[in-house]
From Swiss-Prot:
It comes from Mycobacterium avium (strain 104). It comes from the Bacteria. This is Putative S-adenosyl-L-methionine-dependent methyltransferase MAV_2110. It is an enzyme of class 2 (transferase). Its EC number is 2.1.1.-. Keywords: Methyltransferase, S-adenosyl-L-methionine, Transferase. Belongs to the UPF0677 family. The keyword Methyltransferase applies. The keyword S-adenosyl-L-methionine applies. GO terms for molecular function: methyltransferase activity.
Length: 310
């Protein structure tokens, strides 16, 4: 079902199901030989959501070869490796920010992100998680049942990012006078182009000098045949439906020309360094993800780390 302006979801439907998919990939990456990341909460969270397809994937009852289209460049097989590299990037970002003295962190569209519970935060750090109310409530309750304890002061902000989230964040205790470490992981593709700009504007308005931002930017799709790319995605996930999971991924994102993230942030006073997923994989000693000519692949995604100078 196509997105609407006021649509909502839980972790088994729409955009929320992609958060569960990513957590499942983190769980598999965690359980790999010589794992690059360690997220012990990923698998129990996926199990608690209860989407059978992803539960079977993390337990090994379903393997990527069962559902992947071998002629497609987009495969479930690539997800654990890609999410391991992505997770490592954002984990390292927070580590660097806290080493620089930042003690306030914000995770936008936090989904099943358990960094507040699994990272070693310095004393005095406050972590804010922002997401839809159903998502926040489920994850918080599930982690409490697991006996998990936040490793920092955790403040959850149950608000849709299309609503007045800056007000809700400040009301939750956010201090605009303190430098902040922000992450927007796997978020921009689910926002219309103008909403992406508005989000960056709001982050800047809330950020003190020396704040940092890490984000995942959508590649330039101007040369991509959108209909052809969506058909490729439908083919890639056809066997998912045969195994009981039916989600039209092409309906979840927003098309349209976007401002280049680094250029836009530069205009707001941020200085950015970008690294493509292909480089993150190479730096971690992981196998490259094949690229195709008819669509934008995971390997094209750019990861930016930015610092604000006001």
């Amino acid at each position: 079902m196509p997105r609407t302006d006021n649509d909502t979801w839980d972790l088994s439907t729409s955009v929320g199901a992609t958060a569960t998919m990513v957590a499942a990939a983190r769980a598999i990456a965690t359980n790999a030989d010589n794992p690059l990341i360690e997220d012990r909460f990923a698998e129990p969270l996926v199990r608690a959501v209860g989407v059978d397809f992803f539960t079977r994937w993390v337990t090994g009852d379903l393997v990527a070869a069962d559902v992947d289209d071998h002629d497609s460049g987009w495969k479930l097989e690539h997800m654990p490796v890609a999410m391991a590299a992505r997770t490592r990037f954002f984990d390292s970002f927070f580590q660097g920010a806290t080493q620089a003295g930042i003690r306030q962190a914000v995770i936008l569209a936090s989904g099943l992100d358990a960094r507040a519970y699994r990272l070693a935060w310095p004393a005095g750090t406050t972590v804010f998680e922002i997401d839809q109310p159903q998502v926040i409530e489920f994850k918080t309750a599930t982690l409490a049942k697991l006996g998990a304890t936040p490793q920092a002061t955790l403040r959850t902000v149950a608000v849709d990012l299309r609503d007045d989230w800056p007000k809700a964040l400040v009301e939750a205790g956010f201090d605009k006078g303190q430098p902040t470490a922000w992450i927007a992981e796997g978020l921009f593709g689910y926002l219309p182009p103008e909403a992406q700009d508005r989000l960056l504007d709001n982050i800047t308005a809330l950020s003190a000098d020396g704040s940092r931002l890490a984000c995942e930017a959508i590649p330039d799709m101007s040369e991509v045949d959108t209909e052809k790319a969506q058909e490729m995605m439908r083919r890639a996930t056809a066997k998912w439906r045969e195994h009981g999971f039916d989600l039209e991924f092409g309906d979840l994102g927003y098309q349209g020309e976007r401002n280049d993230v680094a250029v836009y942030l530069d205009g707001l006073g941020w200085r950015s360094v970008g690294v493509p997923m292909s480089q993150l994989l190479a730096d971690a000693g992981l196998e490259a993800i094949p690229q195709t000519n008819d669509s934008v692949s995971v390997a094209d995604t750019i990861y930016y780390s930015s610092v604000l100078a006001k």
